[in-house]
Amino acid sequence: MRILMIVGDYNEDLEVRFPQQAMEMLGHEFHSVSPGKPAGSSVVTAVHDLSDTSLQTYTEARGHAFPVTHDFDSIDATTYDALVVPGGRAPEYHRCDDRILDVVRHFFESSKPVACTCHGIQILAAAGVLPGRTVTAVPFCRPEVEMAGANWVDRGLDGIEVDGVLVTASTWMSNAPWMRAFSEILNGAAV
């Protein structure tokens, strides 16, 4: 299968690297694109730490370079079987890019599998594809999810929610069950 992931500077490091490695390990063709960044370039990721419960928010450090494998402007969304929407900081500005929102809408209108984690839900909310769905995400996104017409469920920081062919996860701590559920959907198995 051909899997597309839209990436940008300061996506969460583990939320881009883990899906890429998991999908490639399973034999899928995995492409990453970023508006304004050509194939062969990279985005800079962010490393988020939620473990210090004395803080009211998470900490952030510069992460690794993550490769952009294809030009965003040259992709044809109809040639992809599934979409991965990672979180981190990139969704803050990606949700304002109509080209990204159009790609996201294509996957939902075509009932293709979508895996979304953490702040990536901001892109789905902006694309208008959440009404009537049950999803999870990092708790900071709950107001946006509910204003977008979805039912937000608290699955902790390491949980997931499956709604049809949409798999949402709370944070990078959900990576293993998130990708397991996504791969089961890709394989046509009931989750």
Per-region residue spans from a language model:
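Active-site-adjacent substrate-recognition loops and nearby beta-strands
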Residues: 138
